[in-house]
Amino acid sequence: MKWSEISIHTTEEAVEAVSHILHEAGASGVAIEDPAELTKEREQQYGEIYALNPDEYPAEGVLIKAYFPQTDSLHETIAGVKSSIDVLPSYDIEIGTGNITVNEVNEEDWATAWKKYYHPVQISDTFTIVPTWEEYTPSSPEEKIIELDPGMAFGTGTHPTTTMCIRALERTVQPGNTIIDVGTGSGVLSIAAAKLGASSVQAYDLDPVAVESAEMNVRLNKTDDIVSVGQNSLLEGIEGPVDLIVANLLAEIILLFPEDAARVVKSGGLFITSGIIAAKEKVISEALEKAGFTIEEVLRMEDWVAIIARNA
């Protein structure tokens, strides 16, 4: 079978939104070529450094590659992807050039091409994200492994916003806590919460592809006795109280439900949220405070922030 590799040149800010659009359109695999990765060390447990080829990365911006089977409707699929991307600036998401190119690849090439971008990555003192096809042995009894299949949906769990959310969970989750993960995507935050000792995690996403991906990853990590996954729009119809809510979403989406978060999380409970570009920190903080939260801590990584807020 022949496959088409669709490459989109965009910005770091738009990576998650564009990746989501591609998965929604039916991509069978997505790879992200971000030149920022060239300055990061990726160490294996035996001290080797992953060698990344600068020639495979754009000089500026981010290149997102998605793989689609060649069908008679491919042109319509690409047109739909372009239309969805063109709408992003209306949500204050800068898309850069947004240029789209299409190349033909053989099945044996696409099946492994995108995997070269994914390796075990230690994202905190506690957690290492490991792709399912990699063999990895923890370096200490304290190290916790989260296995993910990034070919299914919604990235590898190593984006700065995901990393900060996991680090915030490490600081705040107490054994026996009840937690809701809004916009779960791959399920990585729910899995982390379960491995940190939560007694119950409800993971929700509006996208059925995300629900399927999260369910698979939850089972893969043997946390399905703690994490339940369901389809839902934000916190609509969800009853509390719970100890903690975590939401790694676009800033524009976060602004839709601070009041619902205050309703569902118990008094004195926490709301951890990210997906927030630094320029939008103030508007998110103000919305949370208006809903009755107190900002306890702001984590920063590259151009992104995560906020830990406590309910009144």
Swiss-Prot record:
Please give one Gene Ontology molecular function term for this protein.
protein-lysine N-methyltransferase activity
What name goes with this protein?
Answer: Ribosomal protein L11 methyltransferase
Provide the GO biological process annotations: methylation
Catalysed reaction equations from the record: L-lysyl-[protein] + 3 S-adenosyl-L-methionine = N(6),N(6),N(6)-trimethyl-L-lysyl-[protein] + 3 S-adenosyl-L-homocysteine + 3 H(+)
Q: Name one Pfam family in it.
A: PrmA
* InterPro entries according to UniProt: Ribosomal_L11_MeTrfase_PrmA, Ribosomal_PrmA_MeTrfase, SAM-dependent_MTases_sf
Q: Does the keyword Cytoplasm apply?
A: yes
Q: Does the keyword S-adenosyl-L-methionine apply?
A: yes
Major subcellular site: cytoplasm
Where on this chain does S-adenosyl-L-methionine bind? Answer: 162, 183, 205, 248
Task: Give the subcellular location.
Answer: Cytoplasm
Q: Which residues form a coiled coil?
A: none
The Gene Ontology CC terms held by the record are:
cytoplasm
Q: What is its EC number?
A: 2.1.1.-
Q: List the keywords (alphabetical).
A: Cytoplasm, Methyltransferase, S-adenosyl-L-methionine, Transferase
SUPFAM superfamilies noted in UniProt: S-adenosyl-L-methionine-dependent methyltransferases
The UniProt similarity line reads:
Belongs to the methyltransferase superfamily. PrmA family.
Task: Provide the function of this protein.
Answer: Methylates ribosomal protein L11.
**What gene makes this protein?**
prmA
Tell me the enzyme class: transferase
Instruction: State the source organism's domain of life.
Output: Bacteria
